[in-house]
Structure formats: C-alpha cells, structure tokens
C-alpha cells in the first residue's frame, strides 16, 4: 500500500486550483442513467470512486469515455444489476437503484461498502422508493427494486435529513407519473448541483437548496452538457492547511457561497479572508490560529467533512476548542493518531476537547477514513521532523493529486509506492 512521507515544518503558501466536487460528481454520474441521449459532464475530478462509478456504468451497458470531460451514453443500458465486486468499495453505488427502477422498471444493487464511519443505512433510500411505488426485496445481499409501469409521484416526509436518500428519491421521481414533494430534504450544494444537472436534461425540479423539493415527473430525459461545481471540502482543507501553518493561499475555481460556515470559523480563528466570484484568499500574516468551537450540522451548518481538519487546527491553536460531532458516530479516529504526534485532547462521547500545543512532532500514523487522513497529512506538513502516513488509499478516494497540490504550496511530501 502507498504511503506519504512528509517532512516538516513548512509554512504553506501559494495558489491551488480546486477540483470538481466528488460528492456532486458521483450522484450526477449515476443520474446520467436516466438520460436516453448522451451527456457531457465537465470538471469531474480524477478519483478512485469516479473510476469505479464509470466502470459500473459501463458494466450496465452504458458507453462511457473520458477525455477531459466524462461522456456517458446510457441509451444502450441493458443490464440492471450493480454487482458486489464493484459496489463493495463504494457505498455511492446505491445511487444506481433509483435511476434504474425509474427508467427500466427494475434494478438491483449489492449492499454497499465505503468509509468505516458509523452506521449509514440504506433504509431511507428503500422507504423513499417504496413510497414512489417500487416493490423492494432484500435477497442474497442485494437490494432489488421493481415496478410495473412507471413510478408514481408521492408526498414524502423524510424521517431524518439524508443527502444520499434525497438524491435517490429526487432522481427516481424525475420520471415518475405526477408530482413528488420531498419534505425535510437535504439542502447541501451537491443536492442543488444534481438537481440542476437533471433540469439541464429536461427534468422539472424546484426548491433544491431548501428543505422542500418538488419534482414534476416527465416522460423522458434527453442529453446535455453540465459542469460540476467546485469541491467545497477540498477548498476548506487547503484553507485550513494555510491557516495552521501561518501561511497565505489563493484557491481558484472555488465557490465561496458553499462555504459560509467554514469561512466564518476561519475568520474566528484569526484568518484574513477575501472572496470573489470563483476564488477565496486566506492570509494568517504568520500568526498561529486561535482555537474555535465547532458543532457539525447538516447544511447550511458546519460540514462534518471539515471536522477532522478543524480538530487539527484546534490542536495547534492558541487556547482550547471544543468540537462536537452530531452527524456520524465513530468520527474521531484521527485524534489518537494526532496524540502520537504530541497533540493534547480528550474525547467524551461525541465531543473532543482540544488543547492547542505550539508544535507537533513527526511520527508514523495510519489513515482510517478519507477526511481523517487528510488531517494527518496536513499535520505532517507542520510537524517537526518526518511523518509517515500509512493507508493513503483513503485520501485517493476523495482528493485529486493532493501531494502535487501541497508541493506547489511548498510542502515537502512524497508518495512512497507500496510493495
């Protein structure tokens, strides 16, 4: 398995170009199954999960090509089962189910894999599709959905806010007969982006970005061209990289209005921040950040995917900061690794109390999930000495060329190829 070797400490400064959002690109790629004509999707990041999705769409019979953009022609799809060997590495595969049953009247997806953070059940996806008229069976490790004729529009009140289930219901409802209303819908920018993509193909979706989404079913979706929005979590990660090192950064191809909660906390930490239509700059003027209190919440609250990075910020900040994780259980797995590097923290159920130290020291650490591993790499950039980050396949699932981008900011980081 590959590792990163990071030599520190370094002050990170310079420019970085942000990639397209993985968490928008994935639902958009799966939603392309609804289209009877070819679609071109631009600004798709080059990541393992994206490659897996393209392979999965090909196995279903779609024509998939990548040359700059990703081109998908789902016209010839004639296989309706997403097999275990592809699904096991990526839980996003469940997003194939709604489009398959909506367009072809049948679909099966193996129960998914992915990051090891907490329980992420598929129940909400299943109950949403059932309310649209699909018959669901769980057999031999597969979720099997079928419907005779078209799905039927429904008024669906979601038990809890779920990004994944909102995508499933919204995409399936585009081809349902009648109108579907989703109450307590997720409001994330990636949901808005997926809805805008579907509308570009001829869907009739309104209210995306609010907690009430309305979908008027249409007979078919055509082709189109769409550009995926920038990755707000990658943007936030690089802003934190500059903040913890007293540095200065300009993020290009960014979308500031998707990061309000994160930018507010960075300002609280003492960062000087400016924004334009598609850029964000941060300058610490060489200062250490101040500790901040963070409580994760569904959008527009503070994103759980930025929690590990802000935990690290607090661990090297002036003062004490409290991090409360309300979205996923089991999401402080990076803290014991950071303690090996000299950090001071206590964990009490879903709360981490972080006492800032002036300097971390390099150590051998192990990545456990995607965002936790990013925080370990950033810790290595500012720690005294050498840090080895093991199991970095987690990082490759969510960050495009993170080592190249960090090197451009002055980091001393190398990928060490595994045996």
UniProtKB/Swiss-Prot annotation:
Pathway: Cell wall biogenesis; peptidoglycan biosynthesis
CDD domains, A to Z: UdpNAET (cd01555)
Chief location bin: cytoplasm
Modified residues (2-(S-cysteinyl)pyruvic acid O-phosphothioketal): 115
Binding site for UDP-N-acetyl-alpha-D-glucosamine: 91, 120-124, 160-163, 305, 327
Gene Ontology MF term list: UDP-N-acetylglucosamine 1-carboxyvinyltransferase activity
GO cellular component: a single term: cytoplasm
UniProt keyword annotations, A-Z: Cell cycle, Cell division, Cell shape, Cell wall biogenesis/degradation, Cytoplasm, Peptidoglycan synthesis, Pyruvate, Transferase
Reaction(s) catalysed by this chain's protein: phosphoenolpyruvate + UDP-N-acetyl-alpha-D-glucosamine = UDP-N-acetyl-3-O-(1-carboxyvinyl)-alpha-D-glucosamine + phosphate
Top class in the EC scheme: transferase
UniProt keyword Cytoplasm, yes or no: yes
InterPro entries listed in its UniProt record: Enolpyruvate_Tfrase_dom (IPR001986), Enolpyruvate_Tfrase_sf (IPR036968), MurA_subfamily (IPR050068), RNA3'P_cycl/enolpyr_Trfase_a/b (IPR013792), UDP_GlcNAc_COvinyl_MurA (IPR005750)
Protein task: Cell wall formation. Adds enolpyruvyl to UDP-N-acetylglucosamine.
HAMAP family per record: MurA
UniProt protein name: UDP-N-acetylglucosamine 1-carboxyvinyltransferase
Native source species: Klebsiella pneumoniae subsp. pneumoniae (strain ATCC 700721 / MGH 78578)
Gene name linked to the record: murA
